[in-house]
Amino acid sequence: MSYVPIVIEQTSRGERAYDIYSRLLKERIIFVCSTVEDHMANLIVAQLLFLEAENPKKDIYMYINSPGGVVTAGLAIYDTMQYIKPKVATLCIGQACSMGSFLLCGGEKGMRYSLPHSRIMIHQPSGGYQGQATDIEIHAQETLKIKRLLNELYSKHTGQDVKHIEKSMERDNFMSPEEAKKFGIVDNIISSRNATGLLTK
C-alpha cells in the first residue's frame, strides 16, 4: 500500500488537511506518475477539465514519470490536453516511456521540458490478443492502425517526417534529454526552476 503525504495549511477558518496531490492541484500541477491505464486516465482527464473550469486562461503543468501503458488511455489524456483551452506544459521527471513520451511530446510547443537525468523512450505499439484466428487478425489490423496514428501524431509534434518516425520507433528507442530535444519531443532541458519563468509562480 502506497503512502500519500498529508499537508496541513492554516486558513482563516483554522487548519485544513490535503493529500499532497490535491494541494498541488490547487497550483495547477498534475502528476502522471504511474502506468497509463483507464482508471488513472479518467482521473487525469477529470483534473484537466476541472482546472479548465477554474480558469480557462491559466496554464496547467503536467509532470510525467511514467513507464507508459495502454494506448487508448493515453489517447484519452492526449485528446483532452488538445481539447481544453489552457496551455498544458509538460515536464519529464525520471522517465517518460511509450505513452509517457507521447504525452510529454503532446504538451504545448515551447513548453515541453525534461530534467537533465530523465530518460525518454519511444517505440511502436504492441498487442497480445488471444482467441480465434479471425479475431486475432482483426486485432492485428487495429494495432497497425494505431501504429500509423501514433506515427502521424509524433510527426505533428516533433516536426519529423513520418517515415523517420516509423523507423525510429521500430524497436525500443531510449533517449537522453539532449537526444529527445534534438528529436523534437522536448523543447528545453532544465536543471532548476530559475531556468524558465514558466514554472515559477
Curated annotation (Swiss-Prot):
Record's keyword terms, sorted: Cytoplasm, Hydrolase, Protease, Serine protease
Pfam families assigned: CLP_protease
Gene3D superfamilies in alphabetical order: 2-enoyl-CoA Hydratase, Chain A, domain 1
Residues at the active site: S98, H123
Subcellular localization(s) per the UniProt record: Cytoplasm
Residues in coiled coil: none
Any GO BP: protein quality control for misfolded or incompletely synthesized proteins
Record-given protein name: ATP-dependent Clp protease proteolytic subunit
Name of the encoding gene: clpP
